[in-house]
Swiss-Prot record:
Ranges annotated as biased composition (Polar residues): 1-10, 43-52, 65-77, 100-124, 138-164
PTM-bearing positions, type Phosphothreonine: 138
Subunit organization: Binds DNA as a dimer. Associates with MET4 to form a heteromeric complex which also includes MET28.
Entry protein name: Centromere-binding protein 1
Renumbered residue ranges of the record's region Disordered: 1-164, 196-233, 327-351
One GO CC term, this protein: mitochondrion
Protein source organism: Saccharomyces cerevisiae (strain ATCC 204508 / S288c) (Baker's yeast)
Job description of the protein: Required for chromosome stability and methionine prototrophy. It is involved in chromosomal segregation. Binds to a highly conserved DNA sequence (5'-RTCACRTG-3'), called CDEI, found in centromeres and in several promoters. DNA-binding activity is enhanced by MET28. Required as an auxiliary factor for transcriptional activation of sulfur metabolism together with MET4 and MET28.
Encoding gene, per UniProt annotation: CBF1
Ranges of residues in domain bHLH: 222-270
Modification type N-acetylmethionine: residues: 1
InterPro entries membership: bHLH_dom, bHLHzip_scCBP1-like, HLH_DNA-bd_sf
């Protein structure tokens, strides 16, 4: 019977401890959700966070202190009945819950400060970005100081043992939340990269002219050297052309002015000679055309006379045929007479 009564008493006490722990956890969860909503809506600014961080930490410390007092009262009442294992388990759970809530609070503060820093950076430029970065660092440091003050206020032996156990469990809690912190760090890095991109894409400030090379000595020297190179090439081209012109002239000159004057005179003479030759060639062409026309008319006359002579020859042939004389016999008779005349001229004594 005693064992049953003790078991019932332990179960009721466990239920009370569990309900108290659940109430504390619900309060802390509601507080963290409210903070996250305020952070998402952008209602918290850097100044309000700087002023309210102490009160938030104090309220968090008061909540933790209340839960610790509930746990201590429950533990002291059940110290004779429950073993050391149950005490260590409840203390460990309370420490883990407190550590998680504190970490969420600090992380929410850092996120809100980062969001405020990005807004101020987009509004004010790169110079204010560095100042906001410093402000983003200071709240996290200020958030640690109230914790030390709260720890100094709790100086009882029971709380010192509780603090030592919490210190032993903090690394375990941080190890359990490692992936979440790693994800938060990656999100912060992505936010920083996006912030840098936004800053780089911002237009330049008005009223500031970009620094050009036109005012530097190096640019002036480079421009002077390029001008000298252009002038040198121009003179080289002129000298080359004058030398070629001097080679074409019949008289060799030394100075450039004499070469140009002689070239102008020589070109003028060539022009006059060309004009004279053109006139001469024109006259010759006209004469040749006239002679060609005369020769053509004479040729036509000769052709006409030859035609008439051919007609007379044909007429004489017909007459001779009528008389019984062949044209060929007459031709041979004339040939024989010519031979006789030639022989008589060669032998005058025989005649």
């Amino acid at each position: 019977m005693n064992s049953l009564a003790n078991n019932n008493k332990l179960s009721t006490e466990d239920e009370e401890i569990h309900s108290a722990r659940k109430r504390g956890y619900n309060e802390e969860q509601n507080y963290s959700e409210a903070r996250k909503k305020q952070r998402d809506q952008g209602l918290l600014s850097q100044e309000s966070n700087d002023g309210n961080i102490d009160s938030a930490l104090l309220s968090e410390g008061a909540t933790l202190k209340g839960t610790q007092s509930q746990y201590e009262s429950g533990l002291t009442s059940n110290k004779d009945e429950k073993g050391s294992d149950d005490e260590d388990a409840s203390v460990a759970e309370a420490a883990v819950a407190a550590t998680v809530n504190y970490t969420d609070l600090i992380q929410g503060q850092e996120d809100s400060s980062d969001a405020h820093t990005s807004n101020q950076t987009n509004a004010n430029g790169e110079h204010k970005d560095s100042l906001n970065g410093e402000r983003a660092i200071t709240p996290s440091n200020e958030g640690v100081k109230p914790n030390t003050s709260l720890e100094g206020m709790t100086s009882s032996p029971m709380e010192s043992t509780q603090q030592s156990k919490n210190d032993m469990l903090i690394p375990l809690a941080e190890h359990d939340r490692g992936p979440e912190h790693q994800q938060d760090d990656e999100d912060n890095d992505d936010a920083d990269i996006d912030l840098k991109k936004d800053i780089s894409m911002q237009p330049g400030r008005r009223g500031r002219k970009p620094t050009t090379l036109a005012t530097t000595d190096e640019w002036k020297k480079q421009r002077k050297d390029s001008h000298k190179e252009v002038e040198r090439r121009r003179r080289e081209n002129i000298n080359t052309a004058i030398n070629v012109l001097s080679d074409l002239l019949p008289v060799r000159e030394s100075s450039k002015a004499a070469i140009l004057a002689c070239a102008a005179e020589y070109i003028q003479k060539l022009k006059e000679t060309d004009e004279a030759n053109i006139e001469k060639w024109t006259l010759q062409k006209l004469l040749s055309e006239q002679n060609a026309s005369q020769l053509a008319s004479a040729n036509e006359k000769l052709q006409e006379e030859l035609g008439n002579a051919y007609k007379e020859i044909e007429y004489m042939k017909r007459v001779l045929r009528k008389e019984g004389i062949e044209y060929e016999d007459m031709h041979t008779h004339k040939k024989q007479e010519n031979e006789r005349k030639s022989t008589r001229s060669d032998n005058p004594h025989e005649a």
